[in-house]
Amino acid sequence: MIDVNKFESMQIGLASPDKIRSWSYGEVKKPETINYRTLKPERDGLFDERIFGPTKDWECACGKYKRIRYKGIVCDRCGVEVTRSKVRRERMGHIELAAPVTHIWYFKGIPSRMGLVLDMSPRSLEEIIYFASYVVIDPGDTPMEKKQLLTEREYREKREEYGQTFNAKMGAEAIKELLQDVELDKEVAELKEDLKSAQGQKRTRAIRRLDILDAFKESGNDPAWMVMDTIPVIPPDLRPMVQLEGGRFATSDLNDLYRRVINRNNRLKRLLDLNAPSIIVQNEKRMLQEAVDALIDNGRRGRPVTGPGNRPLKSLSHMLKGKQGRFRQNLLGKRVDYSGRSVIDVGPWLKFYQCGVPREMALELFKPFVMRELVKRDMASNIKNARRKIDRQDDDVWDVLEDVIKERPVLLNRAPTLHRLGIQAFEPVLVDGKSIRLHPLVCEAYNADFDGDQMAIHVPLSDEAMAEARMLMLAAHHILAPKDGKPIVTPSQDVVLGNYYLTMEQKGREGEGMIFKDTNEVLMALQNGYVHLHSRIGIATNSFTDKPFTDDQKQKIMVTSVGKAIFNEIMPKDFPYLNEPTQDNIVNGVPDKYFIDKGEDINDYLEDAPLIDPFKKGFLSDIIAQVFKVYKVQRTSDLLDDMKTLGYTQSTNSGLTVGIADITNLKEKPEIVEAAHKKVATVSKQFRRGLITDEERHDRVIQIWNDAKDDIQQKLVDSFDPNNPISMMSDSGARGNISNFTQLAGMRGLMAAPNGGMMEVPVISNFREGLSVMEMFMSTHGARKGMTDTALKTADSGYLTRRLVDVAQDVIVREEDCGTDRGLVVSAIREGNEMIEPLYDRLVGRFTMKDVLDPKSGEVLVKRNTLMDEDTAQMIVDAGVESVTIRSVFTCNTKHGVCQKCYGRNMATGEQVEVGEAVGTVAAQSIGEPGTQLTMRNFHTGGVAGGEDITQGLPRVQEIFEARNPKGEAVITEVTGEITAIDENPAEHTREITVKGETDTRTYSVPYASSVAVAEGDHINRGERLTGGSIDPKQLIKVRDVMATENYLLSEVQKVYRMQGVDIGDKHVEVMVRQMLRKIRVMDPGDTNILPGTLLDIADFKEKNTQAIISGGIPATGRPVLLGITKASLETNSFLSAASFQETTRVLTDASIRGKNDPLIGLKENVIIGKIIPAGTGMATYRHEEPKSVGTVSDSVYSISDIEKQMKAKDGQQGDTDKK
């Protein structure tokens, strides 16, 4: 076998008959498979050992030669070579066909490749191939045309008329002769001539033909090879036949399909030998053709061949297609050894980098290592005994196991793996029981809970794999989420509740006003019962030697609470003391107002001082973010562990529970409900009198009940007791929110109706009182709709992620700096008056392209090519800067990827991105993972005048990325200028908007219903909206330029996600949008050898043009094309990646005709052939191999001087040759 890591690229082409024979080890002549008595393969059959190799290792069929010493000998009795039986997985056979047969992929695909080459319609081809019509191959001296079709009757008449002077045939033989007659060079030249004058339909057809003919010409494939004289038989172990209990056999469908081909082929041979009548022979040839069609792609033409129980047989094409096909089932997702799965359970005692593995599971996973260690320690005499010992689970194996798993990380994965944090590495700790124990803080990254979730565990085997798991994948390193750079391991639920309880303050608790010299004294007082956790006390500030207090504060006494003193013990020594939950306290230390002079009466101070809020979930998150920023990963993960332990301990001590008495009764509720009923009655009366329409009545009733519910909710909030456990849980952010509480103690309110609106009758009861049967029934619809929506959304979101990953998988950070001179001007994204994404968010972690100047003084705030961190970004925003030019993925010049400078900071680490980072995949996951949080619904404005139905949520994201025409499309202007008139045209039910530009004036007619977004006298730029709605990006790219389109798509995606409260870094969306715009459609080829209408990568287009200019020719012109992500995935340069995505047969058909070469640049194609992926540690630069040129700095667009130099050099060379 060839070493897969050695080859650079992979090419595919059409196989010639000679090629097929050269692969083959012999011809399969008989349809037999196995002798059912001896279970030995039959001679010349589909499993013949002489052709495909022995069924047992080192043993010939008759048993004359056994054992390895006869390796390579061919047995003189049975003719079988003595070798390994696994050659039966790689040796092919062939079938010599008695008549040529067309390959269905090339005849039936859309467009029909054969039809294009021959310039014939697929209909007429079908008639010829399946023996319905004759085709004239050589008209001789008759008035017939070449390629003219004749029916059986016409053929007989012509034969009578002209005799043997012309040549007409039917079937694949005829097609083969026609294909052999095609003169590629001549046809290509003629078509190129025609193109100069052709227009419309004719031109399109010519371009398509030229494309195919040119592909044949360039690739060296012969069109006649689309017709086969011989077909390959795949190795028998890839179409196995196994015996089931009860003596029956299960066999792969392919064997049935091959059998039919062989049977029909043998029958045809016999008929030809017997000189049978032509009609019988024709029928047999047609059946052979159909059998081969079924073998290659069953069901593509006519009814599929079925097996027992009317089940269509799986042909060769089906083996590749779809989720169960070879690509997705076996090449992109393999099952691996040394893995297990089990239910997960919480392990609160674990450290952040640990997980609990059940003893038995660990013993099985690490079995070989334990066996080796047992032998090494002389606890077992040999490997066999060691295995027995392990299977018996002797007592002394457990100690060995303990030693073996030290320093060996394992990987834990939870399906669905929506982003890269779905697989993380941990150090195993042996636990009792059968469940895997998971650290509670990593649950959020995995989206795991302990209600029966299962997780899979994998053991990295090689040293490199272990090192990577430990260095790159250890859970303790993954504190920030890749999608937005915010901490993902924030405490939740019990931990939040415990820390909230710990940091509460209460007036007048025991020991209030005591003053201590340091924290140890406080702890002693607490243990001895002198103070309570919530007591407010004083501590001498100078006892905190490392904390950053001001000199003034150090002389004083700090007023704090016992709980906060305990909480601050877990913080880093020199981190500011946390006394109030504000960002100011985190960054600048405790405010002066919490200090009293020594000797001042603390009780007077406490009398007036308000209680400080306890620390809630959001504040804990801010603390973690700040600690990460200052102290980096290691210290943060220690802090998280301490915070977890503290939180669990305190929530246990607090004894917080929920009882029915905690749900209070609201006294004002009956009055509010009564008042609402009266209002509803009034509205109904107005409707009956005809003062308002039914729609208005409905809207008002809904409004009345919503107001009543809000009123009750507000009253509940006002009457809250801060010590009520339910209110503590919801206030701290541990669980539940105000609307849950309203449903328990207030009223449930209005319910969704099946038609998508609201029911007018509200649910007045709450859960404390209990619902009536009627109310319960009304609630069910909304509840069920919620469940079904979630299920549908998950599938949609998963499919979106798959398409995103596919289109961006080859975007990798390839170099440090691409040297581009362009940048992206960013400012805050707004929608009307609403801020969608502030400028600050768009600057953090990006490089500046130009100097940033202070708008007031004009001085340089930030130099160009600087990485902006949080502080720099804040400074720029505070200075009042409105827009900044940054380095962006949009303007990066790196081929097949991006450079460090254009990408900026890696969100997941907070550092500059490293060369080799697979930023495309990360971007796709970051956009896809929150997909499940987006809504499914398309918002309708409910018939309010002047509003369009706009799509939002997941459907809108799909609409943007698939570049579809949006629902509720806006009309945009093609000229820049002033709006001179907006006239109504009642006859047409439209409005006419006139835009007067500098050179021309345009009038746009827009429907009455749509809202006009402009007024007379407004100045408007081309590409801006005249009406409400979404712009069609394909229109925008025509009217404006690529940059404007990219910006529009970026802000539209951000709108959808930010509306739902999901933050995603701009750069992720930029990576995706750039992939949609990486192609150019060539309009005029100039002097290049590109065909008009071809789609080319921008980089390849520039390269071809550079060559044309150097050789003194005219460059090609093209226009940028916006492709949806599905289309963009299928248009990628890698046929392997495209074939494994969708439309497998179409992609492979096209690739083989063009003789495509897959340069193996992306991740997917390398996974498919089993090569190490060229990202991360797999990049050539990191693997001590010759780096490919891809890793070097790519040339930006050639400058004129470069080109002149090259031309000079060329002239010089020519001069030299002249001299010679």
Curated annotation (Swiss-Prot):
Cofactor: Mg(2+); Zn(2+)
Pfam families on file: RNA_pol_Rpb1_1, RNA_pol_Rpb1_2, RNA_pol_Rpb1_3, RNA_pol_Rpb1_4, RNA_pol_Rpb1_5
Organism superkingdom: Bacteria
Gene Ontology molecular function: any one: DNA-directed RNA polymerase activity
Record carries keyword Aminoacyl-tRNA synthetase: no
Catalysed reaction, written as an equation: RNA(n) + a ribonucleoside 5'-triphosphate = RNA(n+1) + diphosphate
InterPro entries in UniProt: DNA-dir_RpoC_beta_prime, DNA-dir_RpoC_beta_prime_bact, RNA_pol_asu, RNA_pol_N, RNA_pol_Rpb1_1, RNA_pol_Rpb1_3, RNA_pol_Rpb1_3_sf, RNA_pol_Rpb1_4
Residues involved in Zn(2+) 2 binding: C818, C892, C899, C902
GO biological process: DNA-templated transcription
EC number: 2.7.7.6
Binding residues annotated for Mg(2+), in chain numbering: D449, D451, D453
Binding site for Zn(2+) 1: C60, C62, C75, C78
Keyword terms: DNA-directed RNA polymerase, Magnesium, Metal-binding, Nucleotidyltransferase, Transcription, Transferase, Zinc
Assigned GO CC terms: DNA-directed RNA polymerase complex
SUPFAM superfamilies assigned to the protein according to its UniProt record, in alphabetical order: beta and beta-prime subunits of DNA dependent RNA-polymerase (SSF64484)
Co-factor binding comment: Binds 1 Mg(2+) ion per subunit. Binds 2 Zn(2+) ions per subunit.
Record's subunit section: The RNAP catalytic core consists of 2 alpha, 1 beta, 1 beta' and 1 omega subunit. When a sigma factor is associated with the core the holoenzyme is formed, which can initiate transcription.
Family: Belongs to the RNA polymerase beta' chain family.
UniProt-listed HAMAP family: RNApol_bact_RpoC (MF_01322)
Protein role: DNA-dependent RNA polymerase catalyzes the transcription of DNA into RNA using the four ribonucleoside triphosphates as substrates.
Protein name listed in UniProt: DNA-directed RNA polymerase subunit beta'
Species whose genome carries this gene: Lacticaseibacillus paracasei (strain ATCC 334 / BCRC 17002 / CCUG 31169 / CIP 107868 / KCTC 3260 / NRRL B-441)
